[in-house]
Amino acid sequence: MRASPLITTLAAIGAALIVIDGDTIRSDEERIRLEGIDAAEIGHAKCEAERRLAILAKHRLEQLLGSGDVDIRRNAHPKPPDRYGRTLARVLVDGEDVACILIKGGYARHWTGRREEWCQSLDRRDLAEATLSCAVSY
């Protein structure tokens, strides 16, 4: 199945949606990375706190995606897939940006263009400042 270049409303096409981790989902055969955020890794966690946060982020993303109508929005001029072959896209539930919700909730942080260390910054006080606002730009 070839995905729409701009918006896919999952209810309209009957696509199955699987949450891989806190920033990656799969819709049918397409792997999608939530653009603009980074969530802790489940399989490659470097400490127990990162692994726990990764599991919480995955569960929160599952809750969000199950709570309403899901739209996957790709750029009109799509970026190439990331180095893992994932499509970069915004994901909205009932019109709300899932990436912003995850950032504000402390489940993810802004993507800076490179993987940041989670274990040293998992003190909630360190994350609190970063989660006060969501200015994910697309």
For the regions a protein language model found, what residue spans apply to each?
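Small beta-barrel nucleic-acid-binding modules, primarily SNase/OB-fold domains
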Residues: R2-Y138
